[in-house]
Amino acid sequence: MQRTGGGAPRPGRNHGLPGSLRQPDPVALLMLLVDADQPEPMRSGARELALFLTPEPGAEAKEVEETIEGMLLRLEEFCSLADLIRSDTSQILEENIPVLKAKLTEMRGIYAKVDRLEAFVKMVGHHVAFLEADVLQAERDHGAFPQALRRWLGSAGLPSFRNVECSGTIPARCNLRLPGSSDSPASASQVAGITEVTCTGARDVRAAHTV
């Protein structure tokens, strides 16, 4: 475009046109000519062939729908499971945890009692150990006297006194009488063969003797 003296543009030679129009592409021009030369039946046949070669979406759509339904069922199962877990959690928080706290407090009291009992058992064991040591010491200190007394009695030749079984005690003021004898006191040789002892005191004392 060129401007004239009056300021109005006027067309000039090959000025103001795009490069593709000034120099058209030969290949594109050939395709336009070929499309223009093709008859209408060929175009319709091409469209029918394209429709025939295009797969029908029915089977694929059905498969997708089945997949979506399966996912929805699984989602529903998951939601029901989540609700069940939520209800169980609420029950645990509201009911079971207070019971557990009470049991915990009770167990702490039991543990304290067990600790006190263990301390008492240790103290008793300590005292028993001391008492046992004292008993052993007393046995060591006084155990020789009864043994010496038994040895002395055994060497004295008085076996009759070891076999006397008495049902009572004989008072100091008591006269021994043998059955069938006189009222005089019995001698030591007669006492050795006593089968029955009678006392003139307030009560009778009976003894059995085995020679």
Curated annotation (Swiss-Prot):
| Highest taxon, organism lineage | Eukaryota
Query: What positions are marked as the site Breakpoint for translocation to form BCAS4-BCAS3?
Result: E60, A61
- Alphabetized InterPro entries for the sequence: Cappuccino
Any one of the GO CC terms = cytoplasm
| UniProt subcellular location | Cytoplasm
Tell me yes or no: is Cytoplasm among this UniProt entry's keywords.
Answer: yes
Identify the main location.
cytoplasm
Claim: Nucleotide-binding is one of the keywords in the record: no
Q: Residue ranges of region Disordered?
A: 1-21
Q: In which tissues is it expressed?
A: Brain, thymus, spleen, kidney and placenta. Overexpressed in most breast cancer cell lines.
**Could you tell me the keywords of this UniProt record?**
Chromosomal rearrangement, Cytoplasm, Proto-oncogene
Q: Which disease is it linked to?
A: A chromosomal aberration involving BCAS4 has been found in some breast carcinoma cell lines. Translocation t(17;20)(q23;q13) with BCAS3.
Q: Which family does it belong to?
A: Belongs to the cappuccino family.
- According to UniProt, the name of this protein is Breast carcinoma-amplified sequence 4
What organism does this protein naturally occur in? Homo sapiens (Human)
Lineage, broadest ranks: Eukaryota, Metazoa, Chordata, Craniata, Vertebrata
- Name the encoding gene, please: BCAS4
